[in-house]
């Protein structure tokens, strides 16, 4: 048995214990698949409350129950702001959920996904179809490489860049650095925009504020928006957009088939509670 699951009173549990002040446990039915990649331990489990779950180094990343919320929010919001996106880059997002949502836009010509760990993509496509959709769209190009190095080699290339990173721990920490956001800016076309997840403003307020501030120092326009993702610690999750030109939702009527995003969500997600308005 791996070090992330344990038997308690005869039941199998996944125990997240990477935080000093908070531990979260999930009772699971079985381990569907797991492997140790060159970068991390990758595991798919079947949990009682949240269904099939992608776990990286013992930390839940997405589930078949609520993964659509995060993936729809990190994808449809920026693609509803840019009026004529043709070329999209996704950095990270190995569960393929963001790419699956982006593929719903027929006007997109290219969806490049740069994921450092091929094992995450392989296991998600095989064992997590509720999130990955077993993606097979020919416009999606999987590039197994370091996203930070990739964008340095591709200047003025993309209309929209989606940074679907894990939490800022280990090799993912660099995806929250100001220098990385500058490289993203340089990789975008003159009217391009980017989005990244900026953590829970409840449990990680400093990171949310720092991310919003760093992007605001580089991009002429930046906005914070929120969604509720039950499996993420703190539940309330934030996303930050940085844009060279476009600021507002341009679609008159949202017509994509989704479970969470609709016309009302496109607008209301930018309405922030008072405690968040203090630093935005």
Model-assigned labels for residue ranges:
Residues 2-43, 213, 234-280:
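SAM/dcSAM-binding transferase cores
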Residues 2-13, 62-193, 203-212:
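The AdoMet/dcAdoMet-binding core of the Class I SAM-like
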Residues 194-195, 223:
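Structural detector of well-ordered beta-strand residues that form the stable sheet scaffold
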